């Protein structure tokens, strides 16, 4: 909001400078965006009277004038402005004057005629961009007076950012209230006395939507002269607030809007059929607006209508048919309170944002309408003449906002502010803010003023007290708190530690939306039901994710489309699985997922560009599982997954419980998702891994280790992992390492069978093992494999 400093000082005039006033307004919570002079720097410009005005003998577009500036003689000045005429009061730059831009006025001859000064336009004095003609001052302007003094051009404009909760400050009165409260000064309101009706003319008003319009005031004013000139003082106030003067009727309603924050509208009375009806539009109903555009209305749009058609979009924009024009003689003034919810969003729907909608959406003082209509009536009659009828007031009191009654506790006030403010001062601040205050022991009960509908809870009062008391007056007190050393379980593995390990292995962390495209998710999890949002951000973000892979694979595609061929990404976060046994029917699991694509290594002169495979990601995952201390309890089992390659994927089990999966993305899915090349993914339930096995210290053997290799032939479908586990189990006391180092099938091995070459490392912590003991342990392993898997030693 932009306003004139002098206009504000008409309401409240603290004895402080403009800069201090701007700082004070900012500290009161209304951030000042800028303070600017209303006119350029100039001197030597005075009020003059055009005594004579005649045609220049040598130029068609110039006039020769004689100007009275209160001196000993009349000044001869040549002027080219089309509006220059005899009897006009003008702004005269006399010889020696300096105008903005360091332009000095000198005596000169123009086409043979002497000119002893210049008649100035607004643009030449850097007051506005209006350069169509010279300034026309009021007829009663005193001759010879400095124009800067006469027009109060030592004024400044102050522009503030008004937060949504302070709609009461979208008018001079609201800002003035805050300045008055801070400076403990009275508020000086202009004359807003009731205008006594001089005629009995009224217009019937009916409100069919009282919830949307709890109060509607209308007043007939007849016999006005729309062609009357808006007084210069009003035009200047409007200009300094960034409003262009249009005609006196519109200027008056804009003036009241800026002064009181109450939007108003004037209808051409003679164009209203029957009476005014405040109602909701019918779906598809059309209204031609003041700017000539046609608006197709929805059923939730509030309109002001007569008995035949809509006249205006309530609180937003007037209609062309009932708008005031040069032929208007009789008007209906409207001053209403519209429920903010009935206005919010309607203007944007039609690509509009007006001063009225801006205020109504945030809220207008429901007790302001009578004051506004009386103020507008007085100004309109003073400028345009006419006679006013009585005010017609249609109010549904039960639908008007109720003033909140709030209890403020001393304990809460001191705790939130961190400083004790004397009770007398607290009471005084609340009363100066307009609250009705009742002191209840050490506490207060306050009724918020009608214009402060943002005061609703106790914290609002605490904020107001601190704001007016002054944040700078609250002493800085160092925060004192006991440092509590929390216990850390050795078994707890930090997710951050795992993330760091992945980053160390060349991965980058991704953070994707929990809202995903249901179509893409259905490709990954065709058998699982997803949670669909009733109010999604967009159609492709309308489902809650069942796994992290939907977002990660989308991130891979996004990066591949931007020339990133080698990718290593991981993410941790929640998945949302419908589950009737869970709270609210949704099970939320913390998941950890990763994806790799492209080449195994970055481009290097000494390394071949090898594509990644299943085992690259499996190795990285095993490194993470090693941190948990549970790698020995983890099994990778061949199981089908709809999103993964059937021959290059595995389910992950921990102590027999399924916790995730790993594998190459199915080729068909790669095609549908536009993935470029082989992509390998994993996902595990982090909460199953967060408690790690605490490492147990054991003695390092000082005795030599012995390695024995065996090759056993087993059926193709026997997992090598089961073979290794059986060897560990049988040789538990002496076998300290078991490793698979070769797999062979083909010549020399029967069809349907495979040969597994296994190394056994044997060692004892107390002595050196004898050859007979080693052979016996190896024999036990072979026998166990024979009994369980029908294995045989390969020749």
UniProtKB/Swiss-Prot annotation:
An example Gene Ontology CC term for this record: phenylalanine-tRNA ligase complex
Superkingdom of the organism of origin: Bacteria
Keywords assigned by UniProt, alphabetized: Aminoacyl-tRNA synthetase, ATP-binding, Cytoplasm, Ligase, Magnesium, Metal-binding, Nucleotide-binding, Protein biosynthesis, RNA-binding, tRNA-binding
GO biological process assignments: phenylalanyl-tRNA aminoacylation
First-level EC class: ligase
Assigned EC number: 6.1.1.20
Bound cofactor: record note: Binds 2 magnesium ions per tetramer.
Subunit-structure text: Tetramer of two alpha and two beta subunits.
InterPro entries for this protein: aa-tRNA-synth_II/BPL/LPL, B3/B4_tRNA-bd, DNA-bd_dom_put_sf, Fdx_antiC-bd, Fdx_antiC-bd_sf, NA-bd_OB-fold, Phe-tRNA-ligase_IIc_bsu, Phe-tRNA-ligase_IIc_bsu_bact
Domain B5: 401-476
Catalyzed reactions: tRNA(Phe) + L-phenylalanine + ATP = L-phenylalanyl-tRNA(Phe) + AMP + diphosphate + H(+)
Domain FDX-ACB: 701-794
Gene designation: pheT
Compartments in which it is found: Cytoplasm
Cofactor entry: Mg(2+)
Organism, as annotated: Yersinia pestis
Entry binding sites for Mg(2+): 454, 460, 463-464
GO molecular function, one term: ATP binding
All copies of domain tRNA-binding, residue ranges: 39-148
Name of the molecule in the record: Phenylalanine--tRNA ligase beta subunit
Broad class of the protein's primary localization: cytoplasm
Ion transport listed as a keyword: no
Family recorded in the similarity comment: Belongs to the phenylalanyl-tRNA synthetase beta subunit family. Type 1 subfamily.
């Amino acid at each position: 909001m932009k306003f004139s400093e002098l206009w504000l000082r008409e309401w409240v005039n603290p004895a402080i400078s403009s800069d201090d006033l701007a700082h004070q307004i900012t500290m009161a919570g209304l951030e000042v965006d800028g303070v600017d002079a209303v006119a350029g720097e100039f001197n030597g410009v005075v009020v003059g009277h055009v005594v004579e005005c005649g045609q220049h003998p040598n130029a068609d577009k110039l006039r020769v004038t004689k100007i009275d500036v209160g001196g000993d003689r009349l000044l001869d000045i040549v002027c080219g402005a089309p509006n220059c005429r005899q009897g006009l009061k003008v702004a005269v730059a006399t010889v020696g004057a300096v105008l903005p831009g360091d332009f000095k006025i000198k005596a000169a001859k123009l086409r043979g005629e002497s000119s002893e000064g210049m008649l100035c336009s607004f643009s030449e004095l850097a007051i506005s961009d209006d350069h169509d003609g010279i300034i026309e001052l009021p007829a009663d302007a005193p001759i010879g007076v400095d124009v800067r003094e006469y027009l109060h051009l030592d004024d400044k404009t102050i522009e503030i950012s008004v937060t949504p909760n302070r709609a009461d400050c979208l008018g001079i009165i609201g800002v003035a209230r805050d300045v008055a409260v801070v400076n403990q000064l009275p508020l000086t309101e202009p004359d807003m006395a009731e205008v006594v009706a001089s005629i009995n003319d009224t217009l019937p008003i009916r409100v069919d939507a009282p919830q949307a319009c709890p109060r509607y005031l209308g007043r007939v004013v007849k016999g006005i002269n729309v062609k009357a000139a808006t007084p210069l003082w009003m035009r200047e106030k409007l200009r300094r607030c960034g409003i262009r003067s249009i005609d006196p009727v519109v200027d008056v309603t804009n003036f009241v809007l800026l002064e009181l924050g109450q939007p108003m509208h004037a209808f051409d009375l003679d164009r209203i059929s029957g009476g005014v009806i405040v109602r909701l539009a019918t779906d598809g109903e059309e209204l031609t607006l003041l700017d000539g555009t046609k608006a197709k209305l929805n059923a939730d749009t509030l309109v002001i209508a007569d008995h035949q058609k809509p006249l205006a979009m309530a609180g937003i924009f007037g209609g062309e048919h009932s708008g005031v024009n040069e032929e208007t003689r009789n008007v209906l003034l409207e001053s209403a309170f519209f429920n903010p919810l009935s206005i919010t969003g309607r203007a944007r729907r039609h690509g509009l944002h007006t001063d009225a909608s801006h205020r109504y959406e945030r809220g207008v003082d429901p007790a302001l309408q009578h004051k506004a209509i009386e103020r507008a009536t007085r100004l309109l009659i003073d400028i345009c003449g006419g006679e006013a009828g009585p005010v017609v007031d249609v109010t549904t009191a039960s639908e008007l906002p109720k003033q909140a009654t709030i209890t403020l506790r001393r304990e809460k006030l001191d705790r939130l502010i961190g400083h004790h403010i004397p009770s007398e001062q607290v009471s005084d601040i609340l009363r100066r803010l307009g609250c009705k205050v009742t002191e209840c022991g050490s506490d207060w009960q306050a009724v918020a003023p009608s214009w402060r509908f943002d005061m609703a809870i106790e914290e609002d009062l605490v904020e107001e007290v601190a704001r007016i008391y002054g944040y700078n007056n609250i002493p800085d007190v160092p925060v004192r708190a006991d440092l509590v050393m929390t216990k850390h379980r050795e078994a707890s593995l930090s997710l951050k530690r795992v993330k760091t390990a992945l980053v160390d292995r060349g991965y980058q962390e991704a953070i994707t939306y929990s809202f995903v495209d249901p179509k893409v998710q259905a490709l990954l999890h065709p058998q699982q039901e997803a949670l669909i949002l009733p109010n999604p951000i967009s159609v492709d973000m309308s489902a809650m994710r069942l796994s992290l892979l939907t977002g990660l694979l989308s991130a891979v595609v996004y990066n591949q489309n931007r020339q990133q061929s080698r990718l290593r990404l991981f993410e941790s976060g929640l998945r949302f699985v419908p589950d009737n046994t869970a709270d609210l029917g949704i099970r939320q699991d913390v998941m950890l997922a990763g994806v790799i694509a492209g080449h195994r290594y970055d481009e290097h002169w000494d390394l071949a560009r090898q594509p990644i495979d299943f085992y690259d990601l499996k190795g990285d995952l095993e490194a993470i599982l090693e941190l948990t201390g549970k790698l020995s309890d983890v099994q990778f089992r061949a199981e089908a997954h709809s999103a993964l390659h059937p021959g290059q994927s595995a389910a992950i089990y921990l102590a027999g419980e399924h916790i995730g999966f790993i594998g190459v993305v199915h080729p068909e899915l790669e095609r549908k998702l536009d993935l470029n090349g082989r992509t390998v993914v994993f996902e595990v339930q982090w909460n199953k891994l967060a408690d790690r096995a605490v490492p147990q210290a054991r003695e390092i053997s000082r005795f030599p280790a012995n390695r024995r290799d065996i090759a056993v032939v087993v059926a193709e479908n026997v997992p090598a992992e089961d073979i290794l586990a059986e060897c560990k189990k049988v040789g538990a006391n002496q076998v300290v390492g078991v490793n698979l180092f070769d797999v062979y099938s083909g010549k020399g091995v029967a069809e349907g069978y495979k040969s597994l070459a296994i190394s056994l490392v044997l060692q004892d912590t107390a002595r050196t093992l004898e050859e007979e003991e080693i052979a016996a342990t190896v024999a036990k392993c072979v026998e166990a494999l024979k009994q369980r898997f029908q294995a045989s030693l390969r020749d």
